[in-house]
A protein has these predicted regions:
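Short beta-strand segments
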Residues: 30-32, 93-96
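Active-site helix/loop of acyl-thioester processing domains in fatty-acid/polyketide metabolism
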Residues: 46-69
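A broad, low-specificity signal marking well-ordered, structured residues that form hydrophobic/aromatic
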Residues: 26-30, 75, 80, 124
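HotDog/MaoC-like acyl-thioester-processing domains
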Residues: 1-15, 84, 88-93, 99-171
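Generic structural detector for well-ordered beta-strands
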Residues: 29-33, 83, 129
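A general secondary-structure signal for short beta-strands and their flanking turns/coil
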Residues: 23-25, 77, 93, 107
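Small beta-barrel nucleic-acid-binding modules, principally OB-folds
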Residues: 68-90
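Catalytic strand-loop segment that frames the active site of acyl-thioester-processing enzymes
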Residues: 2-54, 162, 166-171
């Protein structure tokens, strides 16, 4: 299924699905389609496309997307890391869990987990900033605009003593 069609389906379904809080986990179900696979396994680019769709579902269902449109803010990815544990084959069903994991003064960090039958397939960490007309939007302003009490950890998921690969695979 094409990226834009999936995004349209997610947008429409978000209207009818339960709204979530900024600290909740967004769960989506997918299937690997032939155009997403090289030979017989889902390719790396498709994993990233799915993470973007998961992030958009999160933004739609938290109400953050409406605020971004009203404020003319756009999300920009600063960095992203994916660790693959097992491959997904054509036509296999899998789930994507997306959550806002922590923040600092400038960045929001999303963790996204690919699961098949509750088994870890891959895990990603995506660092996102929002930019408005006058530059980068501070996280404090973002949280204020959501008019909700949020207690996100303000400490990094990964410290200097361990690698991101090890941390993402043990979650």
């Amino acid at each position: 299924m094409g990226r834009w069609l999936r995004l349209l389906i997610i947008y429409i379904s978000a209207i009818f699905r339960k709204k979530i809080h900024l600290t909740d986990i967004s769960n989506l179900s997918f299937r690997v389609w032939p155009q997403e696979a090289d030979k017989k396994y889902m390719n790396n680019a498709s994993y990233w496309t799915i993470t973007e769709i998961g992030q958009m579902d999160f933004l739609f269902r938290t109400g953050f997307f409406k605020i971004c449109r009203r404020q003319h803010w756009i999300p920009l990815v600063g960095s992203q890391k994916m660790v693959y544990k097992k491959p997904l084959k054509r036509f296999e069903r899998f789930q994507l869990r997306s959550q806002l994991n922590y923040c600092d003064d400038k960045w929001l960090y999303f963790e996204q987990t690919f699961l098949k039958n509750e088994q870890l397939i891959a895990n990603s960490l995506v660092k996102v900033i929002f930019r408005g007309k006058s530059g980068n939007v501070p996280v404090s302003q973002i949280l204020t605009s959501l008019s909700t009490e949020v207690n996100l950890p303000r400490k990094a998921l990964i410290d200097d003593s361990e690698s991101i690969d090890e941390k993402l695979m043990t979650r």
